[in-house]
Structure formats: structure tokens, C-alpha cells
Amino acid sequence: MLFQNKYMAITVNDINNGVMIQITGEVDLSISPDIKDKILEQIDFNKKEHNFSISKSIYADLSEVSYIDSSGIASLIQSHQQAAKSGVNFYLFKTSPGVLKVIKLARLDSIFKLV
């Protein structure tokens, strides 16, 4: 467990082809910067460890996110952009119905890789 408060938690686990960042709870302005920081840390780690030669994937597991606001969406967009610049695949994994609805309303489902 990397970060936890009474409303949410962030965990990071290595998987075969990359890293799974599981986000649980509510994602709002109070926590969005922490989420972005954890994702960017993994992007930077991937760059340093693999010297740009092997690109691992980062999966943001949003299956247990009960709420997301515009700051949370902005953090995901910034993470997606930084991953693309770094040659790292960034996926939104198992988005919860509420999060998926927000992503589709904002027409971001054509930008994010949803798995």
C-alpha cells in the first residue's frame, strides 16, 4: 500500500508486462495530485530501469473508484500524455461504471486505452 486515507487508497503492484496501480474510493481534488504523482513515478522508474529500450505498460485499475471529478480526469489525462511522451503504454483497466460514464461524456474514450 502506497497511500491511504479514509476515502481512498492507492496500491502499486508489479505484473508480468508492467505495473498495476489500483485506485480505490473517491478521486477528487484532494487526492488527484497523489494519483498523478504515483503514475508519473512509475513512468520515470520505467524509463530509468529500461533505458528507453523496453517499454512496460502501466495499468490504472479504476474498478473500485466510486467517484471521480474533473481534477481526477485531468490527472489521468496528464499521466496519459506523459506516458505517451516516454513511450510507455498507459491503460485504464476495468473502469467502474460511474468513471466510464464520465470518460464517455467527456469523449475521452477515444483517447484512453480502455481494457
Kindly label every feature range from the protein language model:
Residues 11-40:
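STAS-typified acidic loop motif
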Residues 2-5, 20, 78:
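Intrinsically disordered, low-complexity regions enriched for glutamine and histidine
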Residues 1-14:
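Non-catalytic signal-transmission and effector/linker regions of two-component phosphorelay proteins
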Residues 29-111:
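Amphipathic alpha-helical interaction surfaces in cytosolic regulatory modules
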Residues 113-115:
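Short acidic-hydrophobic, aromatic-tinged amphipathic segments that line or gate anion-handling sites
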